[in-house]
Each structure stands twice: as structure tokens, then as C-alpha cells.
Swiss-Prot record:
Keyword Coiled coil: no
Protein name: Chaperonin GroEL
GO biological process annotation, one example: protein refolding
HAMAP family the UniProt entry points to: CH60
Pfam families reported for this sequence: Cpn60_TCP1
The encoding gene: groEL
Amino acid sequence: MAKDIYFNEDARKSLLSGIEKLSNAVKVTLGPKGRNVLIDKKFGSPTVTKDGVSVAREIELDNALENMGAQLLKEVAIKTNDLAGDGTTTATVLAYAIAREGLKNVSSGINPIGIKKGIEHAVTLASEKIRKSAKKITTKEEIAQVASISANNDTSIGEKIAEAMDRVGKDGVITVEESKTFDTTISYVEGMQFDRGYLSPYFSTNKENMSVSFDDAYILICEKKISTIKELLPVLEKVLNTNKPLLIIAEDIEGDALAALVLNSVRGALKVCAIKAPGFGDRRKAMLEDIAILTGGVFVSEELGLTLENVELEQLGQAKSVKVDKDNTTIINTGNKEQIKERAELIKKQIEETSSEYDKEKLQERLAKLVGGVAVINVGAVTELELKEKKHRVEDALSATRAAVEEGVVPGGGSTLIEVAMYLDTVDTSKLSYEEKQGFEIVKRSLEEPMRQIIANAGFESSIYIHQIKTDKKGLGFDAASFKWVNMIESGIIDPAKVTRSALQNAASIAGLLLTTECAITEVKEEKSNAGGGYPMDPGMGMM
């Protein structure tokens, strides 16, 4: 395949043109007065969104070189969204501003490597300032404010997320699902729930909904596969004497072991239910250990020198209640709170140490099941189009709220970035080279862009407002929703510090790559051949 090669200014100009096109499409969504973007779909209704990353994901340009620029900027939005859950439009606006100002300097002959170093130095100082300025959030009201802003100023979504987080805790699992009604509701699952149902419907205690319900139950947690009833007899006899129900969790239960358990259950001789252990491999072992700690029992494993034949009654786990259906098992725990807390701390440490996103996600699921239960936000809407858009907003708001709980919040509406720019004005840059000073200045100027865009989207000229913010006392900003000067924190116009910091860092990273690009290589576009395969029609020949 032949390639086109572009150098110097030719390459950079086209790349910047692609960045500008994507930025223009995304920036209209910024702020409380931001507009919607309509995205065509090959099948079904078009998508309506006010979410920056959703717009960015859809953009592919016809010109290969411009498209490379657009894809670079798209990376900023996606990376910021993955890391912080929000701030994608801010990151896009910042990246374009830094790239645009930087390329002006490169075009005038200033060394791009020095400019990049200056940008990195300014961003490091700015990020640290954002971290130090952050205010920790603790109340339900503050969480609702963050969630509402991230959900495009929808207070009902903010309140639902705050309610869910208040109930399950900051480490609890909150999932978002589509509701079958028009209303958005929250449902809760207490204790630990995992996706394993009973091995036989004959274990059911409620024949109407085919489910098992036990109160004050014993739980046998076993690593191995159980094939014969002989292995289980000692523990079954001990449980039978207590007249309490028993839940058996094992790798598998089959053959005459399962048949005997079903027979005893049907006859009413023993209240029992058997399920397969959740997870696979090492994760299964870890989850069984979690269940053991949650229920105050012992994990029966031959590796630990414990076999089924010598299990004592006090080594079994206990639960206030157990509910099992064909798909799920829920255990309401009675375990030692101190041991549960220690186990949770161990899992948190593993989350910090792992580099795999998949492992991190699974560890977070385990942590949530251990400490807080699960909240499900069921999103409802009148039309399917509205439902998809609303569900996406709820997911974004949830991610941003987690970021706010993690690192705190800063004044929103772009005012924090203005304050950071003013702080950079006070930094001594005398030891920086000329090129580095230019990079430093580029960041200072670019930090104003998000607020300029928010004000422009509200229909105002930004210069007057930017000047007033710089001269007013700290913490004041322009509320584009009500067109008033307000104290941003007191008015609940706040952004997660992690979102603001990630947006700036990711924007500067991609802009720096663009500035130091000297050559771009694209594939030569093949011209489409005449599909007819015949001779062209003589212009004089009309229709017969």
C-alpha cells in the first residue's frame, strides 16, 4: 500500500485543522447553556446527546491527515472519561487551545521541545494547585450537587445518586439499568449477592416463585467438588440436631450427593440448598474466603488442612437470612465486623497495586459486596431515545461523583482554572529558557478557554466576565444558568478536583505530542473504479 508523507508546517496545519473540527463539534455542549448534538445512526432513530465524549467518539473525517488530528483529540476525551468519568469537553477545549497557541509559536521558529517542557512545568504546578485547593465532600447534599452538575444540571438524577451512595457507602456497588417504567427508581440488595442459583429447583421453599428462603441458616463453604453423600454425612448430622437450615457452597455438587440432598429436602427431613461457588480459578477461592469472613465461618480447603469429614459446627458460617433463586444467591451477613473491615482493607490494597483494569473492576465488585451491598438505579423515560441519553448521563454523573468523593471538589464553571492561571502569574520563571517560558505562558492563556466557552454558550461576550473574575475575590464566579455573580462553592457549582486535574493533564499531553510532530504518514486513498465495468455512455445517446 502506497503512503503519503507530509512534513513540517503542512503536517501540523492539517492535524490542527482536524483537531479544530472535533473541538468545534464538542465545545457546543459545554456548560449549563450548552447545546445538544444530533448523531445520525444507520439504523433506528438518531442519538441526541450533550455528552462530549459521545460526540467525540462519533467523529471520523474524510481527509486522512485531518482525521489523525481528530483521533488525537478524541483520545483526550476518552482518556479523561475513563479516568474521571466527566470533564471530557473541558479537556477537549483545553487541548485545542494549547495546540493552537503552541503551533503559532512553532510556526514563528521557536523550538517545540522547549515549548513542550514549559507546558509540562506549568501543568505540574497547576495540577498540584488544584489538588491543594480541593475541598473534601462528606454530606449527602454536596454529593447531590456534584452528581446534578455532571448529569447536565438534572437535580433529580443528582438526588438519586446521592441517596444510593448514602445507602451503600462510597465503596458500595451502584449499577445503572434500564427501567421497564417511565420513572427512575432505586432498588437495594442487602448483604452479598452473586450470580449463582440453586442446583435443583426441588430445593425451593416457595413453590410460587420457585425460590429458597432460609432464616438463621448455617453455611458450609467448601473449595472442592462433592460427589458422594458419605463426605457430607458428618456435617449434615450435626446441622440436623440444631434444626437449622443449611446452605452448601462448593465447586460443584453432583451424583448421589446431589440426589440425596434433593431427596431429604423434598421429604422435609432437612432444610438444605446447594449452589455452585461463584467465580473461577483464583478468583473463586478469594470469593469463597470473602463469604467465609462475611458469615463468620471457615473456608474448608484441603490446602488449609481441613476436610469435610472433620468440619465442626462452629466452623460453619451463619447468616440472618439466605435467599436463592434460579440465577442469584443473596446472603444477609452476621460476621465479625472487625474481620470484615480488615478483609476490605486488604482488597483495597490489591486494587491500588494491580495494573489490570479487569482485575481492578473485579476487586472493586468484591469490595462492594463485602462492605456495602448493591444499589441499582433503574432509569426510566418516555421514549427509547430519551432513555439511552438519560442512562448515559446517569453513568457519567456516577463516575464523576466517585471522583469527587475520592479527591474532593473545586469551584466549577471554569473558575478554578482561572484561579490556577492567576497563581501561575505569581510563579518565578526566571530560570526557565525562552522556549520554556513560551510554553508556560501558553498554559496560562489556555486555562481561560473553558470559562470563555461556557459564557459564549450562554450567549455573552466572555472578555468582560473573565476580567471581572480576575479582579473579584477568590471563589466568586459567573453562574451561566442564572446569569449572576455567585460564590461557586456555596451555590453548589462545583467540579470534582480529579476531573479538572485529569482534563488539564490529558489535554497538555496530547497537545505536546502534536507540537513535536515533524512528519505524518497516511495511506494513499484509492480511487473507486467504475462499478459498471463497461464503456461510458456516449453523451449524445439519450434514453430510447
